[in-house]
């Protein structure tokens, strides 16, 4: 989906609106979001599972705090999703 910054006034709000549309169109599905920037904060906070990636460029602190899981790079995020045991280990009580 294209993020329409002009329609919503900011990329942060546009991403949130896309998430809301996805949830509405897929009420029985869990929506996972991955990001690291200021513009991803609301997206990760409102996704069913928000994964913040702290890559070489770093990550926005409020986005880190708004996420459910924090990883060091995108490959780790994808590995969590591909390996159910890793995700269970990370999210267990």
Curated annotation (Swiss-Prot):
Source organism superkingdom: Archaea
SUPFAM superfamilies (alphabetical): HAD-like
Name of the molecule in the record: Uncharacterized protein MJ0073
Organism: Methanocaldococcus jannaschii (strain ATCC 43067 / DSM 2661 / JAL-1 / JCM 10045 / NBRC 100440) (Methanococcus jannaschii)
């Amino acid at each position: 989906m294209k993020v329409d910054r002009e329609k919503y006034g900011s990329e942060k709000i546009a991403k949130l609106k896309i998430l809301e549309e996805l949830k509405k169109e897929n009420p029985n599905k869990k929506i996972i979001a991955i990001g690291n920037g200021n513009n991803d904060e609301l997206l990760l906070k409102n996704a069913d599972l928000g994964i913040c990636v702290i890559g070489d460029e770093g990550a926005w602190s409020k986005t880190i705090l708004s996420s459910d899981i924090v990883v060091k790079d995108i490959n780790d995020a994808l590995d969590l999703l591909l390996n159910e045991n890793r995700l269970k280990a990370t999210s267990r009580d």
